[in-house]
């Protein structure tokens, strides 16, 4: 196991970008017993959310394949915190079935985002299509300052 990230291998998209999703993880190769990982956080730890700001709104997109809209909650808490959560139930086992591989996640996930002051928290809209949740938080219009021209005498 190397403690130095490889700059010429792997999936790193840009070694100089501090926000790259493919950043080196020093704990990646550590084996953690499953009993020590919280059941609530273990299921969708990799639930990825994109947040972009347009001139009109803050737009959040989350990939949550296999979930129905009834299994997902979008809430505003503490006035400015957007919370996206959901749960995928474990598939029921039949004694006559033989499982060869179980790779799909089950359990709960929660993601929270502190919204900026310009967010209209009373006008949030959410939709889900093809396993992608889109949450749109409109922004307040930036008020342009009133400018009054002053005539110069003399």
Swiss-Prot record:
Q: Which residues form the sHSP domain?
A: 40-154
Q: Which InterPro entries would you find in this protein's record?
A: A-crystallin/Hsp20_dom, HSP20-like_chaperone, Small_HSP
Which Gene3D superfamilies does this entry report, sorted A to Z?
Answer: 2.60.40.790
One cellular component term from this protein's GO annotations in UniProt: cytoplasm
Top-level taxon of origin: Eukaryota
Pfam families reported for this sequence: HSP20
One GO biological process from the UniProt record?
A: response to hydrogen peroxide
Where does the protein end up? Cytoplasm
The protein's GO terms of the molecular function aspect are: unfolded protein binding
Signal sequence extent: none
Name the UniProt key words of this record, in alphabetical order: Cytoplasm, Stress response
The family annotation for this protein states:
Belongs to the small heat shock protein (HSP20) family.
Q: How does it assemble?
A: Forms oligomeric structures.
From the Swiss-Prot or TrEMBL record, give the protein name: 17.5 kDa class I heat shock protein
Query: Which species expresses this protein natively?
Result: Glycine max (Soybean)
> Encoded by which gene?
HSP17.5-E
């Amino acid at each position: 196991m190397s403690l130095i990230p490889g700059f010429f291998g792997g999936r790193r998209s840009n070694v100089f970008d501090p926000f790259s999703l493919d950043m080196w993880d020093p704990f990646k190769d550590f084996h953690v017993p499953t009993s020590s990982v919280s059941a609530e956080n273990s299921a969708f730890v990799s639930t990825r959310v994109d947040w972009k700001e347009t001139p009109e709104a803050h737009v959040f997109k989350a990939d949550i394949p296999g979930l129905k809209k009834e299994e997902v909650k979008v809430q505003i808490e503490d006035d400015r915190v957007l919370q996206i959560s959901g749960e995928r139930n474990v598939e029921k086992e039949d004694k006559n079935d033989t499982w060869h591989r179980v790779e799909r996640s089950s359990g709960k996930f929660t993601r929270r985002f502190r919204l900026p002051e310009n967010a209209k928290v009373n006008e949030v809209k959410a939709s889900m299509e093809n396993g992608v949740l889109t949450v749109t938080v409109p922004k307040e219009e930036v008020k342009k300052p009133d400018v009054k021209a002053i005539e110069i005498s003399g």
